[in-house]
Structure formats: C-alpha cells, structure tokens
Regions:
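Class I SAM-dependent methyltransferase SAM-binding "motif I" and its flanking Rossmann-like core
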Residues: 95-153
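Glycine-centered tight-turn and secondary-structure capping sites
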Residues: 92-94, 254
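Loop/turn-to-beta-strand initiation segments
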Residues: 3-5, 75-79, 155-156
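Short glycine-rich anion-binding loops that position phosphate/pyrophosphate groups of nucleotides
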Residues: 12-13, 83-87, 163-165, 224-226
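Conserved helicase motor
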Residues: 54-62, 136-139
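A contiguous loop/helix-start segment that scaffolds small-molecule binding in enzyme catalytic cores
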Residues: 2, 156, 163-280
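Short active-site oxyanion
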Residues: 26-32, 104-108, 156-157
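Glycine-rich, flexible N-terminal cofactor/catalytic loop recognition
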Residues: 1-59
Length: 280
C-alpha cells in the first residue's frame, strides 16, 4: 500500500504560526523532505521533534523526486516543506506533486502561511481578482518580457523579490507600468520589524535611492485601469502578423509575442500561431 505525501506550510517568520496539524504530521512522518535541511532542522529542534531529513530542491529534484516516490510506493509517509510558507508555490514541490499524481500516490495539504496572500490583504489594493506572478527573472530581458506580458492585466499582481534585485525590478516596473501605479512593498512578514510601504512606483524608487532594501520582499502591484467599453479595439485595423511583429520589435520573443497577441484578441494561441506562420 502506498504512503502519502503531506504538503506542510511552515511559519514565514513567527514560529507561533505553526499549526497543530503541521506538528502532528511531523511527528507521524517517516521522512521530511526539505528545501533547506538546516533551516528545517532548526524548526524541528524548536519543537523537540526528531525525524530523518532529506533535501529536495531545484538542483536535485529529478533524482530526489524518484527517490521520494520509491519510498512512498513502499508505504512511507513523507512530509514536504519549503524554506518558509506553503510548499509547491513557486518552488520545486510542484514537480513532486505531479510525480505523485502520475504514480497514483495520495497527496494532501496542511494549510498555513502564504507570504503572497498575507501581503495582499495588508496592501490596501483590490483583492477580488489577483494573480500570483512569483519571482521575476534575474535576466534583465526575461524580466522585462514578463512585465510586458502582464502590464495590461487589470487584476492585482503579486511578485516575490530579493533585496539585491529590488531596485532594478522597480526601475523596470516604472518603465513598463508607469511610475504612477500603486504598489505595496511588504517585508519581514509576521516578524518584529514587519513593514508595509504603500506608495506609487515612482515614490518607491525615490525611497530606495536613499535607503538600502533589507529582507525578502513581496510586491503587490495595482492592476491596469479598465479599458472603457466604448474605446475602439486598436487591433481591429491591423493583421495578426502585424500585431505579433509589433511586439517582437519591442523586444519580445516570437513565442511571447504570439501569446500576448492572442490574449489581446481573445483568440487561442494556436490560431494566432498558425495565422502568423501561414505562407512560410
């Protein structure tokens, strides 16, 4: 009989946020798979729990994924945790969940802290519709392409960012979204020095030109303004090929340009791809 994989959310700063169910899962586990075993060991030691640990992260997920699946198939119950917060959100836990599903292994979640959601509800920005965008690329071109893809989205956007990248990211957001977009910069969530800075992108750039970013950030960015229904569709007067070529000229890859043009026209990507390459 197969074991079960438990996705356990762990505190994002305050150890008092650990749930009774999380501790129960730790105590009942045959093995705990952790993104950083040293960090998880500190958590276990705090609660006087002694369990075997194995690492599972972006750089070993393929071999460790197969290893964990083999243990689950032999009836072992395994807990998966990330460094902090909920696993499988913008981390390699997503791949392990897929492997379990492919192998008919039960997966369950033990809910708890999620930095993005906590930052969102503190931001003061609309929460009815939002999109989690995760970490932006360290590559400037890829980062700008990502921002271009979402600049016209009307829902609130959630990003994770490291302190050493924050200034470059804000600069790219200013160029792509405009400096008057509202943003909330949330750091040190649930900790003593928790901070929420609510301002515009321009104001954030001015602030961090004089203050060094510290700690991991969640950036909550206001969505684009709704387009008036009476406004003429700017894409009606150009062909799909011209539409895609426009985005390519702005620096997008052909794949991303086709995806963006399809979204603009509310068409399937495959239809836009076929039309763009027709006659080649």
């Amino acid at each position: 009989m197969n074991g079960k994989l438990y996705l356990c959310a762990t505190p994002i700063g305050n150890l008092g946020d650990v749930s009774a169910r999380c501790l129960e899962a730790f105590n009942n586990a045959d093995l705990i798979a952790a993104e950083d075993t040293r960090r998880t060991l500190q958590l276990l030691n705090h609660f006087e729990i002694s369990k075997p640990l194995t690492s599972y992260h972006e750089h070993n997920k393929h071999e460790k994924g197969e290893y964990i699946i083999s243990l689950l198939k032999n009836g072992k119950n395994i807990v998966l945790v990330s460094d902090a917060g909920t696993p499988a959100i913008s981390d390699p836990g997503e791949d392990l969940v897929k492997l379990c599903i492919e192998n008919d292994i039960d997966v369950t979640s033990i809910p708890g802290p999620v930095a993005g959601i906590n930052a969102l509800i503190l931001s003061g920005l609309p929460t009815k519709r939002f999109a989690f965008e995760g970490f932006l690329s360290v590559n400037k071109r890829h980062r700008k392409e990502h921002l271009e893809l979402v600049k016209n989205d009307t829902h609130t956007l959630i990003f994770y960012e490291a302190p050493h990248k924050l200034k470059n990211t804000l600069s790219d957001m200013q160029k792509t979204f405009g400096g008057d977009r509202k943003i909330a910069l949330v750091r040190e969530l649930t900790k003593i020095h928790e901070e929420v800075k609510r301002c515009t992108i321009d104001e954030a750039i001015a602030y961090y030109s004089e203050n060094n970013p510290r700690g991991e950030y969640v950036l909550i960015v206001e969505g684009a303004k709704e387009v008036e229904e009476t406004e003429e569709n700017e894409w009606e007067n150009i062909s799909i090929k011209e539409h895609v070529d426009k985005y390519i000229a702005e620096g997008m890859t052909s794949k991303d340009a086709i995806k963006k043009a399809a979204a603009d026209r509310n068409l399937p990507k495959r239809d836009v791809y076929n039309e763009y390459h027709r006659g080649e």
